[in-house]
Amino acid sequence: MTLDSRYGGEVYGGSKVVKRMEKYRPQNAPKNRQRKLLLPLSYGISSSTLLHILNLQLERQISSGLGRRAYDIHVLNIGTCEQSDSHRLGLFREAYPLHTYTQVPLHSIFKHDTTIKDVISEYGGPEFADDPSKTDQERLDIFRLSLSTATARADIDGILLTRLVVAIAKEQDCDGILWGDSDTRLASKALSNVAKGRGFSVPWDVCDGMSPWGIQFNFPMRDLFKFELSTYASLALPKSLNVVDSERPSVDNLSNKNMSIEDLLAHYVETQGQKYPGVMANIVRTINKLQPQSADTDHKCMLCGMPVDYSGEDPAIIGGQGSSQYTLQDWRERPVAGTLCYGCARTRLDLVPPRSVSS
């Protein structure tokens, strides 16, 4: 459907999102407390549009005399660099004053996720012993720069981001997390996870429901394509927010060493999705039909938190219990005591000692 007018665009886009939020209707709200949902904001089109649509919904509830909102929204922005963009977050706070806001850098994961220090040390091996004399930014940089490929860095960044979002959501006593992933984003994420050996965890990364982290994951934008959201944002969002599409590395040179699997598949899905939207939509719909095994298990990956498949597709320990032909052997003989899924074990092979990393 083409969003060819402001009214039509808002009705079309907003109704699909609101429908996905039906479980949080006022009629279903607990009577003894106010529900709170965390919304990670990247300043991109998808998460910004999600905030805009839900803000409109809550404003309508307030003006209709319901007595209270169905839920509160806590907006979280995670900066990827040392210098935070507090001015930009202030623009969103001014445009949508109903909500509370928090901004933290990625390296604050050492503060909010109390187990990550030991996890990184175990995952990295003896070369990655934690140095308390270094700042959190330096500790994170050493670990990230020790990943020798763009795909490995993007993979670990995504895991750390999820862990930090979950940790803050629990600190804020949130009932769930509202991810702003569009259908386009979910399709590319599913394909890249399969390519990286994380196919077993795809249902938890793409589908609504209880996550292995013990908190609800919701994807209200899952029925909208990226190009639809771009049109909606250009019509509906306040111009002062200056929301623009995030730029990815050029794919003109497919051998570009700075290009990750995520970048390549995101470009493929976005370009092909405009030509064949039904095909890309079927990726997410098919995954949504999968029935993941119970996340309530003691066998979880120590890094990504996903349940480990003991049927043979995932090695429980590198070179250990995994009986599959795909079990990985780390030629550096760096044993790990914790449990790793196949995807994290494979990414671990791209780690190099810090002394070999050139800044």
Swiss-Prot record:
Compartments, as annotated in UniProt: Cytoplasm
Domain of life: Eukaryota
Protein task: Plays a central role in 2-thiolation of mcm(5)S(2)U at tRNA wobble positions of tRNA(Lys), tRNA(Glu) and tRNA(Gln). May act by forming a heterodimer with NCS6 that ligates sulfur from thiocarboxylated URM1 onto the uridine of tRNAs at wobble position. Prior mcm(5) tRNA modification by the elongator complex is required for 2-thiolation. May also be involved in protein urmylation.
Name listed for the protein in its UniProt record: Cytoplasmic tRNA 2-thiolation protein 2
Involved pathway(s): tRNA modification; 5-methoxycarbonylmethyl-2-thiouridine-tRNA biosynthesis
HAMAP family in alphabetical order: CTU2 (MF_03054)
Protein's GO biological process: protein urmylation; tRNA thio-modification; tRNA wobble position uridine thiolation; tRNA wobble uridine modification
Subcellular location, principal: cytoplasm
Keywords: Cytoplasm, tRNA processing
Protein's UniProt keywords contain Cytoplasm: yes
Family of the protein in this entry: Belongs to the CTU2/NCS2 family.
Keyword tRNA processing: yes
GO terms for MF: nucleotidyltransferase activity; sulfurtransferase activity; tRNA binding
GO CC terms, sorted: cytosol
